[in-house]
């Protein structure tokens, strides 16, 4: 455990990690302080950070298991104590760390009698098992136990789909932050009250609380970047006076208006993230798994490239093209 004194400054806004500990391989704790803040600012920041920590942080987990020997999910295998369903639930609990998007293949192939743990998972170098002692199955007889696994990086909770080709999808929970809380302490006199924000973060070990804080902060910054380049010309209301219509402008014209030259347009494109394009969750996840994170990444692909993305439908391609045309006056090569 690491403890530090909390400095209270009346001048420069500062943050510190005042407590950091690992209760186990699957439970990390961090306590952070931000001060000095004006009255009301601590609650604003605390609320936004907590929502970002719990809902926006991406994680990696096992999403599917494959075995041709298994007739259905609720069957049992001779020589193994656990049912297939129990094995799937154990795989769901395995904590995995990976910074890469897309599907990664892994497998388990052992011979009993054996106590199978996460250590027996053979995975690519880009995937790390956080706790190799996590239990998967108990083999009581001299039989072979071989299953294939799919590992994906995503965020939030995703329900499984119907199994195909001897595959058994797992309800994926890509939420590395287990909990996040904040508290506020006020100080100073009535005329000049200031606040200290205390932020507590618990993670599952796939990333540290400090890493989670960094990622949550970056996600919030990405959400607010469009407001820094807001187009304010010719704003108008329709006849209804209740419906606000933002003016349309070609993307390159908008870049010129905010003072961005040709040489810097790539930087501007890189600062527009695909989560700002109002895509459906399904389309967004497919693009993210293909390492398409920004508008620049998207424009580097052709329509044919999008059609080749796993689970990406023709209507998804049409939706992306429609957004690019209406919002940016752009298109993709066929």
From Swiss-Prot:
Stored SMART domains: RPOLD (SM00662)
Location in the cell: Plastid, Chloroplast
Segments for region (Alpha N-terminal domain (alpha-NTD)): 1-231
UniProt cross-references to InterPro entries, sorted A to Z: DNA-dir_RNA_pol_insert (IPR011262), DNA-dir_RNA_pol_RpoA/D/Rpb3 (IPR011263), DNA-dir_RpoA (IPR011773), RBP11-like (IPR036603), RNAP_asu_C (IPR011260), RNApol_insert_sf (IPR036643)
Cellular component terms per the entry's GO annotation: chloroplast; DNA-directed RNA polymerase complex; mitochondrion
Highest taxon of source: Eukaryota
Listed CDD domains: RNAP_alpha_NTD
Region annotated Alpha C-terminal domain (alpha-CTD), chain positions: 264-334
Signal peptide coordinates: none
Annotated GO biological process: DNA-templated transcription
Pfam families: RNA_pol_A_bac (PF01000), RNA_pol_A_CTD (PF03118), RNA_pol_L (PF01193)
UniProt GO molecular function: DNA binding; DNA-directed RNA polymerase activity; protein dimerization activity
Catalytic activity: RNA(n) + a ribonucleoside 5'-triphosphate = RNA(n+1) + diphosphate
Main location: plastid
Enzyme class: transferase
Keywords annotated in UniProt: Chloroplast, DNA-directed RNA polymerase, Nucleotidyltransferase, Plastid, Transcription, Transferase
Sequence similarity: Belongs to the RNA polymerase alpha chain family.
Function: DNA-dependent RNA polymerase catalyzes the transcription of DNA into RNA using the four ribonucleoside triphosphates as substrates.
Note on domains (UniProt): The N-terminal domain is essential for RNAP assembly and basal transcription, whereas the C-terminal domain is involved in interaction with transcriptional regulators and with upstream promoter elements.
Quaternary state and interactors: In plastids the minimal PEP RNA polymerase catalytic core is composed of four subunits: alpha, beta, beta', and beta''. When a (nuclear-encoded) sigma factor is associated with the core the holoenzyme is formed, which can initiate transcription.
HAMAP family on file: RNApol_bact_RpoA (MF_00059)
Protein name, UniProt field: DNA-directed RNA polymerase subunit alpha
Species of origin: Amborella trichopoda
